[in-house]
Amino acid sequence: MSQRDTLVHLFAGGCGGTVGAILTCPLEVVKTRLQSSSVTLYISEVHLNTVNGASVNRVTRVSPGPLHCLKMILQKEGPRSLFRGLGPNLVGVAPSRAIYFAAYSNCKEKLNNIFNPDSTQVHMISAGVAGFTAITMTNPIWLVKTRLQLDARNRGEKRMSAFECVRKVYRSDGIKGFYRGMSASYAGISETVIHFVIYESIKRKLLEHKTASAMDSEDESAKEASDFVGMMMAAATSKTCATSIAYPHEVVRTRLREEGTKYRSFFQTLSLLVREEGYGSLYRGLTTHLVRQIPNTAIMMSTYEVVVYLLDG
């Protein structure tokens, strides 16, 4: 791959990630709050003892739904809070996606000379290498973004800035504090691999269908519109499947990035979540995550493909 091609994929990946992050930021904030332990509701219930008739007070842990969480944020913190962490998100998403797509494209090109071109092995290894590279280089940015999104303040209260967050993390945990949750992110590479394998498979089928069908009679703009919609559908379908399978790592990662020392490692957090909150806690925020990720991934992937097409064309 030439230097120009690498720069094209870097730029296209950055554009796709930035556009998707801006449009879906409010859903990202709601999802992060739902994944954390800070929004658990404690409902007091009075039960009558069947033996002596005395009343017994029991406290039940309940996870609020996406709409309830959204309502709480709007009531207590105001609409601006739905864009908390957007700064670090934009700072991180462009280089993260740029690094990811450049690493993916370079790795895929090299592996095509070793394995069958565009085979499942090629896409799996390329996606894994790209995910590992991007996670390692950008984890500190995502930790700051998560902390800012979990920083709930009432209307009128001074909000913590990204620089204040960085100083706070460094004072409490040092440099290693910026890499909390990275083990869960590495576990999430499985989601990335599943996503790209399915995406490339659907994309290949669409290209085969396009070649086989008699589309020569259609005008160029109609073909381009059809390609764009096809890529968006491929991205949305593949991301839905991958997220549904590998979602628990997202919850574990958010808990690890919370302040405090209760959650220490990936497997310790996983077992603690199941023991204290049940298996359902591993899928807290999944609905909101899917509602956000499907359009975000569709926008990101289609923007990436369009930018590459325009720059290469």
Curated annotation (Swiss-Prot):
One of its GO terms (molecular function) is pyrimidine nucleotide transmembrane transporter activity. The chain crosses the membrane at residues 7-27, 41-57, 113-133, 182-202, 228-248, 293-313. The keyword Cell cycle does not apply. It comes from the Eukaryota. Pfam families: Mito_carr. One of its GO terms (cellular component) is mitochondrion. Its main location: mitochondrion. Disulfide bonds: none annotated. Solcar repeats lie at residues 4-110, 118-205, 226-310. One of its GO terms (biological process) is mitochondrial genome maintenance. Keywords: Membrane, Mitochondrion, Mitochondrion inner membrane, Repeat, Transmembrane, Transmembrane helix, Transport. Mitochondrial transporter that imports/exports pyrimidine nucleotides into and from mitochondria. Transports preferentially cytosine and uracil (deoxy)nucleoside mono-, di-, and triphosphates by uniport and antiport mechanism. This is Solute carrier family 25 member 36. It comes from Gallus gallus (Chicken).
